[in-house]
Structure formats: C-alpha cells, structure tokens
C-alpha cells in the first residue's frame, strides 16, 4: 500500500509538471544575411564581443559614458528595479519550501470547578492553580505542490527577474549609444561653429570691401546688397548652430546625470573616435542571443507561460500539511524528556466548488497574456532586425555620400580660388566670387553633417548588434 501511495504521488507530481505549456521560442521568418550587408572585411570584429571602452577611443567620451552609467537617474532606476525583481523572486522561491518555526510557552492558570460539601460551605466552588510548559518545532500549512502551482509561481518570478536584468542591460546599451551620439553631435557642431565664425568674418570683410567699392563708384548697389544678404545668412546660420550646440550640451548633461569634470581629458579628432576595424554584421539568427531586449522579451514570454500553469493548477485541490513535534509538561524541570514528548500532524485540502467562472476567467487572462508576450517578442525581434539593417544600409550609403561630398568640396574650393584669381584679373564680377564662396560654405557644412551622421550610424550599428553584451567585462 505505501508503495502504491508513493507511485500515485509521483504520478501527480509528473502531471503537475505538465500544467504549464512547454517553452518554445517563437519561429520567425529570417534571412541568411541582412539586406544590403557587405561582405565581411578582413579583420572585422563582432560587436557583442567588444566592450564599450575598447570601441570608443576618445578618452573624454569614455569618461562621459562612465559618469553616465554611474549617475544617470534612469540608469539608477533600472538597477533598483533589478534589485526589486530579485527580491520578489526570492520571496516566491522560498514558498516552495516549508517554513519551520519554534514555539515555546509557559502558562499558569487558575480554574474553578464545582466541589463537595466543604466547597459548598465556601461558596460551592473549589479552585486550583495549574502550570503547563511546552516547546515545539512545527511546520505550518506547507503546500504539497502536486500540481506545480508554487513551482510555476517561482518560475514566473525568476523569468521576470531575468527579464528585468536584461532590460537593465538594454537600457545601459541604449544610454551608451545616446551619450556617444550626443557627444559626437556636439563635436561636429563645434566644427560647424568654427566654420560659421570664419565665414561670418569673411562676409563682414566682403561687406566692407563692397561698401568701399560702392562709394568709389566702381561697384553697384546690387553687389553691396548681395554681400550684406550673404552676411545676414551667415549670421543666421551661426545663431542656429549656437542654439543646436546649447541644446545638445544640455541634453548631454541630462544623460550624464551630473556636472561633467571641469578638466576633462583631451578629445580625439572626430575621424579617430571609434575602433578602426569594421564591425561584422554576423547572421540574423545570432541577434537573438546578443540583444538584451530580445532576451528580455523571451523571458517575459517564459513568465507568461509559467503563469498559465499557475492558473491551471487552481482547478485542482490545494493540499497543505501542518505538523509539530516537541515537549509539554506541568513542570519545567525535566521538560525535555521522553515521557513528555508530543507530536501532531495533519493535512488539509482546499478546493473551491463554485466560483462563478473566476478560475476559468483567470486562465483566459493568463492565456491572453501569453499571446501578448508572443506578439511583443516577435515585434522586438522584427524591430531589432530593422535597426541592424538600417545601420548597415547607413554604413554603406553614408560612405558613398561622404566620398562624393568630399569630391564636391574639393571642386567648389577650386572654383572659389579660381573665382578670386579671375576677379583680380577683372574677368568676373564680385557677385560671382560671392556665389562661389557661398556654395563652398554650404558644401563644407554639409560635409561636416555627413561625417557626423556616419559616426552616429556606426554607434547605432554597435548598439543594434548588442555591443559588448558577450564581452564579459564591466560596462
């Protein structure tokens, strides 16, 4: 009989393991290679295996990123949420094991009971004082988890904890990218500001020259007004760049979370900001294991499926066990002795019979949440694929834009120099010189913006490929 009981309990335990759906990663249509990706270059490196201090070479940028990871308020919230989720998981996991308590009591009581003739003379009651001492170790309402309810609660809490850890890593990676992109935008704006300041000075000189020529009668009012208009345009653009620089600097201070060091390290030129070897795109399937946001979405799906097991277990009886063992005696001396030993044990069963569809509705909610988690996982994967594809396309076509714009700037610089020479020779008028200089200024500004976009795109590629997530170093 005991053997049959053990077999039955084992069968129930195995059945309990089947209440939660088996976790399987949703299948998504993927391609072998990202669209528009170039062939891997010799010496290319895997982004997920490069720590951010190795990828970003500028010492000032590294200082800013390190400060942001320490002081950024959103980062601090993400870290605290990890601690919260860890605590919740420990609470749930502790419910899988019995809670053992120690009870000790000493009771002294007086009782009045009906007595005999002598007692009647004293009022009909006889009294006595009694003492009772006890010490017991017991287990209170330990649930025998035949159906896996407590185990699935623990599994769901564990998955939520792991999802929170990955969400914190995803935010950390995003913060690194935001700080780097903002810093590079500031450095680019500083270069554009210097170019704009130089252009404004040149435009002011041209206005003075045009005024002298106008007063001397060798230039027209059209030439003078054209010079003034170009000066106004340059000054307007200078103000726009200053506004952009101020906003980007304010945003960087917000990201860093504190006042930056008053004496930061010397920065590197923009063309030496990043690691020189090209980043390898890798296979799309590898992204599932390197992007923390994808891993977090899968853990949330795992938690949703564990909660289905919890909801299904509610249809079965909950069996709890309460027991204790110890000693009890009317005298304190000799309390812990064999003749004073006591024990008790007893199971309890709880099963709601009528709940007006509450358990069925709870199961429906759990299944709906699983479907939501599947959709969110698929959406996260698709968004990640798109981010990588966009960054790869940007790497390819921004390089083409940069090469063409550099050639355009060289051509326009030659035109501006020739216009100056031919103006000195009297072949062209001053308006043609101004037009050549304006075209060169616009082209140089565009070149700086393309270089900035190229750097920001490389940062986006590093982030979208899960940069540093498998490096195993402190980030």
Where are these regions (language model features)?
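Terminal intrinsically disordered/low-complexity segments used for targeting and assembly
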Residues: 2-70, 118-120, 158, 242-289, ...
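Small/polar-residue-enriched beta-strand and adjacent coil segments characteristic
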Residues: 19-26, 50-51, 57-66, 71, ...
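Charged, alpha-helical scaffolding/interaction elements associated with membrane systems
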Residues: 71-72, 216, 425
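Amphipathic alpha-helical coiled-coil segments
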Residues: 78-92, 171, 175-198, 202-212, ...
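Secretory-pathway/luminal and periplasmic proteins that interact with or process carbohydrate-rich
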Residues: 90-91, 111-114, 236-239, 261-262
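Residues at or immediately flanking beta-strands
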Residues: 99-101, 221, 251, 318-320, ...
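Repeat-solenoid scaffold signature
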Residues: 215-244, 446
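Short coil/turn motifs that cap or connect alpha-helices
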Residues: 220, 259, 428-429
């Amino acid at each position: 009989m005991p053997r049959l009981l053990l077999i039955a309990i084992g069968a129930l335990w195995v059945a309990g393991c089947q209440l939660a759906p088996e976790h399987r990663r949703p299948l998504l249509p993927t391609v072998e290679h990202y669209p528009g990706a170039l062939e891997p270059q010799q010496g290319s490196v895997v982004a997920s295996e490069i720590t951010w201090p190795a990828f970003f070479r500028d010492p000032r940028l590294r200082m800013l990123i390190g400060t942001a990871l320490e002081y950024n308020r959103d980062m601090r919230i993400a870290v605290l949420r990890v601690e919260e989720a860890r605590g919740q998981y420990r609470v749930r996991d502790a419910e899988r094991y019995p809670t053992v308590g120690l009870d000790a009591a000493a009771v002294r009581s007086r009782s009045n009971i009906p007595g005999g003739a002598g007692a009647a003379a004293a009022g009909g009651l006889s009294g006595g004082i009694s003492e009772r001492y006890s010490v017991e170790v017991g287990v209170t309402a330990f649930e025998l988890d035949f159906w896996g309810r407590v185990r699935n609660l623990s599994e769901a809490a564990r998955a939520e904890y792991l999802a929170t850890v990955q969400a914190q890593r995803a935010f950390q990676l995003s913060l690194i990218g935001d700080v780097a992109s903002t810093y590079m935008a500031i450095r680019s704006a500083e270069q554009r500001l210097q170019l704009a300041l130089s252009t404004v000075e040149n435009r002011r000189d041209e206005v003075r020259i045009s005024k002298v020529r106008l007063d001397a009668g060798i230039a027209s009012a059209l030439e003078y007004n054209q010079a003034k208009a170009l000066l106004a345009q340059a000054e307007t653009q200078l103000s726009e760049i200053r506004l952009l620089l101020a906003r980007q600097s304010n945003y960087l201070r917000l990201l860093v979370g504190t006042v930056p060091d008053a004496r930061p390290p010397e920065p590197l030129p923009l063309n030496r900001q990043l690691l020189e070897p090209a980043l390898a795109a890798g296979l799309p399937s590898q992204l599932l294991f390197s992007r923390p946001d994808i891993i977090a979405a899968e853990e949330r799906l795992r938690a949703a499926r564990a909660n289905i097991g919890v909801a299904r277990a509610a249809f079965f009886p909950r069996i709890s066990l309460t027991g204790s063992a110890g000693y009890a005696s009317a005298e304190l001396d000799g309390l812990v002795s064999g003749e004073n030993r006591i024990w008790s044990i007893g199971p309890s069963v709880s099963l709601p019979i009528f709940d007006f569809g509450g358990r069925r509705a709870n199961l429906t909610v759990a299944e709906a949440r699983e479907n939501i988690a599947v959709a969110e996982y698929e959406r996260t994967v698709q968004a990640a694929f798109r981010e990588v594809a966009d960054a790869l396309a940007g790497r390819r076509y921004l390089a083409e834009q940069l090469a063409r714009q550099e050639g355009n700037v060289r051509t326009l610089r030659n035109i501006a120099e020739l216009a100056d020479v031919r103006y000195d020779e009297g072949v062209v008028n001053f308006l043609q010189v101004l037009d050549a200089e304006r075209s060169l200024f616009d082209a140089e500004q565009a070149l700086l913006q393309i270089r900035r976009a190229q750097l920001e795109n490389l940062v986006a590629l590093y982030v979208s490929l899960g940069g540093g997530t498998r490096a195993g170093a402190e980030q």
